């Protein structure tokens, strides 16, 4: 007779609880950031766009401006402001180039790299041109 497995044991590839919590926090923060940008007159063109270089949280458009937006959620807005490292900036720039290759209809748009900072009990803080792609 075959031994049955314990139904309470975790699946072999189950995510750690802290990773699940971080994922949920990220999804919630991105939704808040998108709603905030929409209220400011942007249209969300893409969410969580994955490339070989990494993921772009939001791509937002307003008129002829295309903003690649990194969303950072932290306990305090000031902590979030320092969360986009130079290495992450380069990853986002590379991912934006991949997005533009996949969406050539936006090639003539003005490009910008923004951040939206999210913290509990605070309004989102939008940082237009949080960093640039120039070397």
From Swiss-Prot:
Report the protein name in the record: UPF0102 protein RPC_0320
Q: Where is the signal peptide?
A: none
**Pfam families referenced in this protein's UniProt entry, alphabetically:** UPF0102
Q: Which NCBIfam families does the entry link to? A: PRK12497.1-3, PRK12497.1-5, YraN family protein
Species lineage: Bacteria, Pseudomonadati, Pseudomonadota, Alphaproteobacteria, Hyphomicrobiales
The species is: Rhodopseudomonas palustris (strain BisB18)
Q: Name the SUPFAM superfamilies for this protein.
A: Restriction endonuclease-like (SSF52980)
| GO MF terms, alphabetically ordered | nucleic acid binding
Instruction: Tell me the superkingdom of the source.
Output: Bacteria
* Similarity comment: family membership: Belongs to the UPF0102 family.
Q: Please give the CDD domains that the UniProt record associates with this protein.
A: PoNe_Nuclease
Q: Which PANTHER family match?
A: UPF0102 PROTEIN YRAN
């Amino acid at each position: 007779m075959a031994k049955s497995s314990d139904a309470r044991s975790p699946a072999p590839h189950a995510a750690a609880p802290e990773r699940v919590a971080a994922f949920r926090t990220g999804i919630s923060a991105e939704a808040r950031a998108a709603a905030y940008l929409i209220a400011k007159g942007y249209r969300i063109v893409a969410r969580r766009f994955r490339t070989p270089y990494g993921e772009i949280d939001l791509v937002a458009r307003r008129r002829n401006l295309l903003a690649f937006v990194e969303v950072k959620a932290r306990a305090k807005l000031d902590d979030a402001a320092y969360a986009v490292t130079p290495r992450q900036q380069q990853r986002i720039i590379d991912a934006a180039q991949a997005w533009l290759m996949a969406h050539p209809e936006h090639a003539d748009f003005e490009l910008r790299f923004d951040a939206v900072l999210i913290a509990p009990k605070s309004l989102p803080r939008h940082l237009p041109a949080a960093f640039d792609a120039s070397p």
